[in-house]
């Protein structure tokens, strides 16, 4: 509860005014239950998943009051009829069984007696990721029950969810493969937008860009139909140390960008800039660059795995199939332009070729078996050591599908190579999990998902890499093969410097100091 209170403090500071509290899921019913104490029996819960963790009604009321004092409305979710393994463990039948439906109504009654409507005017009933024979009847009955208890029901509204009741608000969602925007005209129910992608699915760069450039709810301004944005974080892989959640899933950088865009709105959608930043000197680029600076200044002491990257410049060559790799590599190292390849000029230290689901990137339609080279040139005033955040893939926190931790001396398990001033450089960092944790398939409902992540599985949670540079111009060439669709294909390279106990971006390698406008601008892509 104390962790949640600290999170609510930060949400209030960002003017985020709602907290969607997911109180039940596969492992357990986390709410104190007086009518059916078996729901709080540790032996009925999924073992290894905080089996003793239950919120008392006193704790729940206390958190509601705490949030309300900070102008944050809690939206509790009691997920039904899916995501409820614990329920069948307790009663021997699923929620959508007639006996289960009766029990659910009693549970809703108890919750609403304990948590009054003036404290909790909304109640989310889940209804996602499940197909049952009586789906519409189930959703309608549960929504009507919530309505009769003086609450506004809310349901998830994805492709594999139960039909949304006419009484409910809809919560639209997508995960890694989310493309396009909600169309307000097609939404029968008032709706929340959760289609920007989950915080647990992406790296820091693309999360910030998605939330900053995307048009919330598919409309320039909110209204009584287009209600607002809810950002989702589902660390489905077992978490051992809860303090690692905001380190492994960059919730605060993503929430900064979500708050910025949700409050200001945007006249036109700029989702195309998530995979590749807008050109320099455009209004959209300048607005994003200024936002990065503000975000860096306001990051504070919270876990904040984001380094502004819009200043990094690239020349990109490719993609080419495997049989041309050596030819192109040799040409680039010799300073020649490879035949038949038109270089692409782009910006952003987080450089995306194809995100894991293919939703974004410079080469989002490219298939595995191809390779891309990224070249960046920068200036160092002196010979010495430059540090940079460097990475090439990372798993979603809901599943382990990923190329894994680099082996000793390697940059990735995908054959990544780096040359500094035409001399190949091996990775100077060695990890305790070197060469491990490679999974080319999803690990949901498998023993692998019960193994907690280590921070070193995420490039943004590792220490920066030292590079030896010369005085004057330096060139770094990165070769990045695409080995399989389990891989998030791209390059992250962001020069950083120490500022107190934190590492912050160091743009001095790319530009001379200059006075920059510090006013507050929203982009018009």
Short names for language-model regions:
Residues 128-205, 211-213:
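C-terminal active-site-proximal or functional interface alpha/beta core segments in diverse enzymes
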Residues 366-379, 460-465:
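Short beta-strands within extracellular/lumenal beta-sheet-rich domains
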Residues 19-21, 74-78, 123-125, 153-155, ...:
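Hydrophobic faces of well-ordered beta-strands that scaffold small-molecule active sites
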Residues 176-312:
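Flexible, acidic glycine-rich loops studded with aromatic residues
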Residues 4, 382-410:
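A short beta-strand element within beta-rich, extracytoplasmic domains
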Residues 1-149:
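Substrate-binding cleft of carbohydrate-active enzyme catalytic domains
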Residues 290-369, 377, 397, 430, ...:
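Accessory carbohydrate-binding/adhesion or oligomerization-edge regions at the termini
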Residues 54, 401-404, 408-493:
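Beta-strand-rich ligand-recognition modules
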């Amino acid at each position: 509860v104390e962790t949640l209170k600290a999170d609510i403090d930060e949400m209030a500071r960002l003017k985020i005014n709602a907290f969607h509290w997911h109180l039940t899921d596969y492992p357990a019913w986390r709410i104190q239950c007086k009518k059916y104490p078996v729901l709080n029996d540790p032996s009925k819960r999924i073992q290894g998943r905080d089996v003793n963790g239950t919120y008392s009604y006193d704790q729940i009321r206390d958190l509601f009051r705490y949030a309300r004092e900070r102008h944050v409305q809690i939206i509790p979710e009691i997920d039904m009829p899916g995501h409820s393994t614990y329920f069948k463990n307790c009663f021997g039948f699923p929620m959508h069984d007639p006996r289960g439906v009766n029990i659910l109504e009693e549970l809703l009654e108890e919750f609403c007696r304990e948590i009054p409507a003036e404290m909790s005017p909304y109640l989310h009933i889940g209804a996602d990721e499940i197909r049952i024979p009586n789906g519409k009847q189930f959703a309608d009955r549960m929504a009507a029950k919530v309505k009769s208890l003086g609450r506004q029901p809310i349901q998830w509204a994805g492709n594999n969810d139960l039909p949304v009741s006419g009484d409910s608000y809809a919560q639209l969602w997508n995960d890694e493969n989310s493309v396009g925007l909600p169309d307000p005209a097609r939404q029968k129910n008032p709706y929340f937008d959760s289609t920007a992608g989950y915080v647990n699915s992406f790296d820091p760069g693309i999360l910030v860009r998605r939330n900053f450039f995307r048009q919330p709810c598919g409309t320039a301004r909110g209204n009584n139909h287009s209600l607002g944005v809810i950002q989702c974080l589902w660390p489905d892989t077992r978490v051992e140390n809860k303090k690692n959640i905001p380190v492994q899933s960059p919730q605060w950088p993503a929430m900064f960008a979500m708050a910025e865009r949700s409050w200001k709105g945007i006249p036109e959608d700029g989702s195309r800039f998530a995979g590749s930043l807008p050109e320099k000197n455009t209004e959209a680029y300048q607005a994003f660059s200024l936002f990065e600076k503000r975000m860096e200044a306001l990051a504070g002491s919270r876990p904040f795995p984001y380094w502004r990257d819009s200043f990094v410049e690239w020349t990109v060559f490719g993609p080419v199939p495997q049989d041309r790799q050596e030819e192109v590599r040799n040409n680039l190292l010799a300073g020649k332009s490879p035949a038949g390849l038109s270089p692409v000029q782009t910006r952003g230290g987080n450089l995306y070729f194809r995100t894991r689901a293919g939703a974004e990137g410079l080469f989002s339609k490219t298939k595995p078996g191809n390779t891309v080279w990224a070249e960046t040139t920068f200036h160092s005033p002196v010979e010495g050591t430059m540090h940079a955040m460097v990475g090439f893939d990372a798993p979603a926190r809901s599943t382990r599908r990923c190329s894994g931790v680099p082996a000793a001396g390697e940059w990735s398990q995908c054959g990544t190579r780096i040359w500094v001033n035409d001399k190949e450089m091996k990775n100077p960092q060695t990890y305790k999990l070197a060469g491990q944790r490679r999974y080319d398939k999803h690990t949901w409902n498998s023993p692998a998902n019960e193994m907690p992540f280590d921070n070193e599985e995420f490039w943004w949670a590792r220490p920066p890499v030292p590079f030896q540079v010369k005085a004057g111009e330096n060139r770094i060439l990165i070769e990045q093969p695409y080995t399989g669709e389990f891989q998030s294909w791209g390059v992250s390279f962001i020069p950083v410097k120490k500022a107190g106990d934190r590492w912050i971006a160091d743009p001095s390698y790319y530009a001379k100091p200059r006075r920059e406008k510090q006013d507050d601008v929203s982009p018009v892509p």
